Amino acid sequence: MGQYSVESHENGEKVYDLICVGFGPASLAIAIAIQEMLPEARPNVLFLERQQQFVWHSGMLLPGSKMQISFIKDLATLRNPQSSFTFLNYLKENGRLLDFINLGTFLPLREEFNDYLQWCASKFANLVSYGETVTLVEPVKNNNTGKVDNFVVHSKVGGIEETRRAKHVVVAVGGRPLLPKPLPEYHPRIVHSSQYSSRVPQNLTDRNAAYRIAVIGAGQSAAETFSDVASRYPNAQTTMFLRGDSLKPSDDSPFVNEIFNPSATDKFFQTPAAERHQQLVENRATNYSVVRLELIEKIYNDLYVQRLRDPSGASWKMNIKNHTEVTGFKNLSEKTVGLQMTHRENGLETVENHEFDLVIVATGYARDMHQQILDPTRELLEDATVARFPINRDYRVQFSGEKVSSDAGIYLQGCNETTHGLSDTLLSVLAVRAGEVVESIFMKSASNGHSNGHSNGHASKVSAKKAEVYTNGNGHNGVTSNGYH
């Protein structure tokens, strides 16, 4: 497994065919696609990962939490149902296939899907350099052609700087935790949901203490942490703050779910920008600020039992305050946080100050970490002043054809929702998308070029003969989607 090999050099320096920045599900799907689509070409590939080991939503692997997506939308099945990297083959290899079938579900535990991802990642351990943070990607111009034909990838490992060169770079760094503006980026008592499982027990060590806990957010992660923390600390006062009027169920009905089909990406990309924005707004109920209905019903039942046992509300441990958002922050101590909460309803505004022992923030992620990493490459764009890096359908950054060789390029993963649709940050299209990226990098014809960036066909059309054309390479060590969708 993961046997990419044979080195290429330029002026005595090793040049990789591809370096992937980040080794989460997106890059892992690419690793699988390379192995299956290029069985003979064996390109020279390296994956760089900031974490010390493969991890996927480790902060939200809560007891009993399930996936929100069918296991069939794993890292390989939709591209190659016969792949050895399917979830079903993982079950077979681990002796649980029949037992899982007996469960009668398409939604495995998140814990099990994480184990599946780690199982896949272990096959490429020799192609990954863990504990390495990429800081910058710089273009390298060929003095003979005057065009950029490779890139220098700068990284740090334990304070030591590393540089490597690659013809192609895939940036799949996931999202960074997004906090409401009044809150500081770091405070020991403010925890983003992505760090929930590790930091909450560190901060709240007494399971029986009467802590004051706030949960900010209205989506799946907010609801899960609200329910879980109330269960972990039964004597705590836990309050959930929503900007809207209530927790709303996610829409995963069959017709709506078609927006997550791989073919929907083509349609969305070809849609005018104004219409794309409108479609994203219309379909927010599939992914943003929504909760699985069964969890909503559980929370409602918990609140109902409180009301049954104490109609006065004096002893209630769980509360939801709607139409309320954070408008101020005060650092009271290392163990206490002061929040100013503003309630707006029916044209009236009420401001309240609260003290909490812990604030859990589940307000999503920003998908902009690639901007700083790729800043030196902006000079290669037709317009270096644009806010976002423009990309083609095949996820390749639209650099000027006069500045960058057609045999070099940068690809973005998981930060293209405005051009490729709601599925871009999710698991839904990873298998097919990985095939498209691999085909664009290693199998593109001259007609693909920089002008349109479209891949001519999908993985099923790739032939072994096509694969033989490409350079062999010698690998060093073998991506986030953040959503569970």
UniProtKB/Swiss-Prot annotation:
Record's catalysed reaction(s): L-ornithine + NADH + O2 = N(5)-hydroxy-L-ornithine + NAD(+) + H2O; L-ornithine + NADPH + O2 = N(5)-hydroxy-L-ornithine + NADP(+) + H2O
Q: Which cofactor does it need?
A: FAD
Keywords noted in UniProt = FAD, Flavoprotein, Monooxygenase, NADP, Oxidoreductase
Give the EC number: 1.14.13.196
* Alphabetized SUPFAM superfamilies for the sequence: FAD/NAD(P)-binding domain
EC top class, in one word? oxidoreductase
Q: Which GO terms describe its molecular function?
A: monooxygenase activity
Pathway listed for it is: Siderophore biosynthesis
In which domain of life is the source organism classified? Answer: Eukaryota
Function (record text): L-ornithine N(5)-oxygenase; part of the gene cluster that mediates the biosynthesis of desferriferrichrome that chelates Fe(3+) to form ferrichrome. Fe(3+) is a key factor for induction of trap formation and the fungus uses the iron chelating desferriferrichrome to sequester Fe(3+) to inhibit trap formation and increase nematicidal activity.
Q: How does it assemble?
A: Homotetramer.
What's the protein here called?
Answer: L-ornithine N(5)-oxygenase
Q: Which organism is it from?
A: Arthrobotrys oligospora (strain ATCC 24927 / CBS 115.81 / DSM 1491) (Nematode-trapping fungus)
Q: Report which gene this protein is encoded by.
A: Ao414
